[in-house]
Curated annotation (Swiss-Prot):
Record keyword Signal present: no
Source organism: Phenylobacterium zucineum (strain HLK1)
InterPro entries the record matches: Exonuc_VII_S, Exonuc_VII_ssu_sf
Gene3D superfamilies: Exonuclease VII, small subunit
GO CC aspect terms: cytosol; exodeoxyribonuclease VII complex
Principal localisation: cytoplasm
Keywords: Cytoplasm, Exonuclease, Hydrolase, Nuclease
Protein name: Exodeoxyribonuclease 7 small subunit
HAMAP family on file: Exonuc_7_S (MF_00337)
Family: Belongs to the XseB family.
Record GO terms (molecular function): exodeoxyribonuclease VII activity
Annotated catalysed reactions: Exonucleolytic cleavage in either 5'- to 3'- or 3'- to 5'-direction to yield nucleoside 5'-phosphates
Amino acid sequence: MSEPADIAAMTFEQALAELEQIVARLESGQAPLEDSIRMYERGAALKAHCETRLEAARLRVEKIVMGAGGAPASEPAEFG
């Protein structure tokens, strides 16, 4: 299932901000059922987008290490 084009174009920060707004509205319990379902679906798409962006960022992060002969070098960072 692909995400809507407007979500695909969002930065991590934009998607997270909208996701936080949706969560707050859902937690308030004030939205009608159909609106809540639509917000939940959009929230799920935003969450997936944020996870994808975070994974891409994680793969780009490198750590600086001392290579052979004391020269600085970089290698992929390991998380977990």
